[in-house]
Amino acid sequence: MAARMGSKVAAILAILSVLVVHGSCKGHPVNYNVSDASAYGSGWLPARATWYGAPTGAGPDDNGGACGFKNVNQYPFSSMTSCGNEPIFKDGKGCGSCYQIRCNKDPSCSGNIETVIITDMNYYPVARYHFDLSGTAFGAMAKPGLNDKLRHSGIIDIQFRRVPCNYPGLKINFHVEEGSNPVYFAVLVEYEDLDGDVVQVDLMESKSAYGGATGVWTPMRESWGSIWRLDSNHRLQAPFSLRIRSDSGKTLVANNVIPANWSPNSNYRSIVQFS
C-alpha cells in the first residue's frame, strides 16, 4: 500500500511540475501535429509518458475508458493500454490504434519495444505527445525486476511510432450497446487489424419500413470513441449489415452480422477482417 501511494505521489508531483512550467491546463498552447503522430513510417517521435490506475492494472478502475472498450484487462488488450492526448486520441477517431513505445533515458528503462492500444483520453498539456499508460504498460518498459522503480519515476521521456494492429485469430467484433432498441441502435466496433480505428460506420436494414429490400446504406453517427449510433424515425428492420471505413480509407462490409433477434449488451462476431 505504501509503495502504491508513493508511486501515485511521485506521478502527481511530476505532472504538477510540468503544469507549472506550462502555466496550467489553460496555459501556453501545445504545438500538436496530428498527421505526424498518426502516420505510419514517421520514424520514432519523442513523447512523455505517465501512468494511472493500479500498478499492474489496465488503467481505468472499470477496465474500460473513453473509447468504450470493455474488459481491457483481458485478451486481446491484456492491460497494454494507454490514454492519448489530442494528436493521438483525435476526438475518438484514434481509438483502437496501435503504437510501439520504448524508453532509454531513465536508468530503469530496458529500451525494449512494447506495443500499446489507445483506449482512453488525457488532454493534460504535459507534452506535444503524451501517453498516459496503464501501470502494466508503463512497467513493461523497465529492465527485469525494475518495474516498480520505473513507475516511481512518475513521468519519463519515451519514443513512439504508429504500427499496424494485429489480432491473430480474431475477426471484427460488434457489441450492441445497452439501451439499443427498435428505433435507436448503438454499436461498439473492435478488434480491427491494421489501422485499428474506425472513421465511419454505415448500416443497411434487411428491408424497408414498407417491406421491400432497401439496398441503402444509412450513415451512423459517432457517439463517442469507438461507439456508433443510429437514431431512426422508424422501427429498424433487422438483420443489419454494417459497413466500416478505417483511417486509411479501407472499407469492409459485414453482411447480416446483426441478426433479427439481436439483443442489447450482446457481442456479434463477424467473419471479416482487414488485411
UniProtKB/Swiss-Prot annotation:
Where does the protein end up? Secreted, Cell wall; Membrane
Q: Any signal peptide, and if so, which residues?
A: 1-25
Mainly localized where? secreted
Residues with glycosylation annotation: N33
Give the record's membrane topology: Peripheral membrane protein
Q: What induces it?
A: By gibberellin (GA3) and wounding.
Q: Which SMART domains match?
A: DPBB_1
What tissues is it present in? Expressed in internodes.
What's an example Gene Ontology biological process for this entry? plant-type cell wall loosening
The Expansin-like CBD domain covers: 183-270
Task: Supply the alphabetized keyword list.
Answer: Cell wall, Cell wall biogenesis/degradation, Disulfide bond, Glycoprotein, Membrane, Secreted, Signal
Expansin-like EG45 domain location is 64-170
In this UniProt entry, which cysteines form S-S bonds? C67-C95, C98-C165, C103-C109
This protein's GO CC annotations: extracellular region; membrane
Coiled-coil blocks: none
What family is reported?
Answer: Belongs to the expansin family. Expansin B subfamily.
Task: Give the protein's function.
Answer: May cause loosening and extension of plant cell walls by disrupting non-covalent bonding between cellulose microfibrils and matrix glucans. No enzymatic activity has been found. May be required for rapid internodal elongation in deepwater rice during submergence.
Identify the PANTHER family for this entry.
EXPANSIN-B3, EXPANSIN-B6
Name of the protein in question: Expansin-B6
